[in-house]
Amino acid sequence: MKRYLWLLFLVFTLPAAAQIEEETTEDDKSESIADSTAIDSLARDSLFLPWPQSVQHYVDRLLQADMFETSQVGLMVYDLDADSAIIRFNERQLMRPASTMKVITAIAAIDKLGGSYQFKTELCYTGRVENNVLTGDIYCVGGFDPRFNSDDLKAFVESFHKMGVDTIRGNIYADKTMKDNDTLGEGWCWDDDNPVLSPLLIGRKDVFIERFVSELRAAGVVVEAATGEARKPQDAFCIVSRFHTIDQILMRMLKESDNLYAESMFYQIASSTGNRPATAESARAVIGRLISKVGLNPSRYRLADGSGLSLYNYVSPELEVMLLRYAYRNGNIYLHLLPALPVAGFDGTLKNRMRNPFTSGNVKAKTGTVMGVSSLAGYCTAANGHRLCFSIINQGVMHGRNGRRFQDRICEALCSPQ
């Protein structure tokens, strides 16, 4: 009876599962009706199949939908408790991940940097302070902290008051040597709303020194100094440092799919190698070693950036699943990764999706959307209590809602009681 009641629920609720903030075209409406009819019949067909065969049968029928005449999908579902794959379809096909690339970046970052890592911005100077006058050079040293904000800048300004400085004579430099001079990622579209890849930002903008000088003057400090860019000397004295934790960065990076935060994380990975300046190539090398560690060949994939904006990223559902498995089996990574993932029906980019009782609060996964691509990768718990990880990449979908609907139905089947 329990299985029968669930299947009745599945039949009547699946067509409305995905909450989409996109205008519905006439083609979408007709496809929705056709999909709903197919779902109803395949749910009835799955009535008496045991887990996981019933889900496999359900997925097989979903894959017969008309949308796959003009689009592709790769998916893999892995039972973490049984340590075995339960669903595979085109799982090794190379596809653009869109923002599920952020999951790869996040796992690599926690693995390489550790859960206590902090993003740091420093204020340093050379010279001397006499009679309330600082004569020398000031260095604002960027560590690519995307959360550096007005409060942090005020702390920089207040540090001079604490030193008794009311006049600055010399130079005020931006030290941006933490990373290379590339301000855009490889393979980014010129007409996208791309973040600026500068290691010294304020409010996400590359106007740090201008804002700093303005705040100094507003606080009554006389600034008689030229501005420019230069590396901080080794003998410079650091007045104050501002920090943000890796968890703070992960939270916005994954829940809100923030591209700037993801690229900052990508360059922290690169910086951890000790190479200066940090480059995308260095980050790729670190992630490549992690891919080897999970038993796959990094040369099979193309990793261009940390956010998934690039047209040059090519990964597979298998790669994403194996990295999610690695994170789960390494407690420190999982401890920091899981709370940062969007939660179905509750927050982030999944707030308005999968609100039914079995998936809401259960599915924790990263979404991905770029033109023609819709993806979802993360974790959920099946009705039998087993933890699952999964990756679904829809490619060639001209209406993202169709990909999201497919992904939601897969997750509902995984989470619902049999």
Q: Where are the regions a protein language model picked out?
A:
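Active-site SXXK
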Residues: 83, 97-115, 172, 211-215, ...
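Soluble periplasmic/extracytoplasmic beta-strand elements of cell-envelope proteins
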Residues: 74-78, 86-88, 105, 137-141, ...
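Active-site-adjacent helix/loop patches that line small-molecule binding or acyl-intermediate pockets
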Residues: 43, 47, 121-127, 133-216, ...
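Bacterial Sec-dependent N-terminal signal peptides
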Residues: 1-26, 46
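A small/polar active-site loop signature that marks catalytic segments
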Residues: 205-338
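Extracytoplasmic
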Residues: 68-72, 90-92, 98-101, 116-118, ...
